[in-house]
Amino acid sequence: MKSEQINRFLDVLNEYHSLGIAEQIDYQKFYLYSLITHSTAIEGSTVTEVENQLLFDDGITAKGRSLQEQMMNLDLKAAYEHSMQLARKHADFSVEMLKALSALVMKNTGSQYNTPQGSFDASRGDLRLLGVTAGTGGQSYMNFQKVPAKLAEFCQLTNERRRQLMDTDDLMEQYLLSFD
């Protein structure tokens, strides 16, 4: 990233803090509704941000939306809230932690699968035991046999990088970690 871009980013961040924008709106709540609505839309949910607000704040389900869609949104909210607790504790990443988060995401919408390689249950956070593609004839994702080792490697590298960044006030490096 170029020096002028870094300086501009830091200037905008300082202006944001000095204006007190974070205190003017409930940013965490706004972010939560937006994140969940858009993330579940990728998976086919048609629940809107307003409908999620009613569901999360008041327990009012959306008319005309399937139970599965609404459970998908509630499950993702639970996983998000749990991940924020882990972040506040600075918990290390581990394969088991990621599987537990996956179980929360898929709690009410995940299924059990029986494959020639064995059975697994997405609602329990089990790692898949089959190949995955993006649509029929689409791009293939990593071979399922490589996933456990690659997840462990990801966790180790992320934990090492986080430890390095906890000892610095370099906002740019902390920001860039979210894209690594």
Regions flagged by a language model, labelled:
Residues 1-180:
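FIC/Doc superfamily catalytic core
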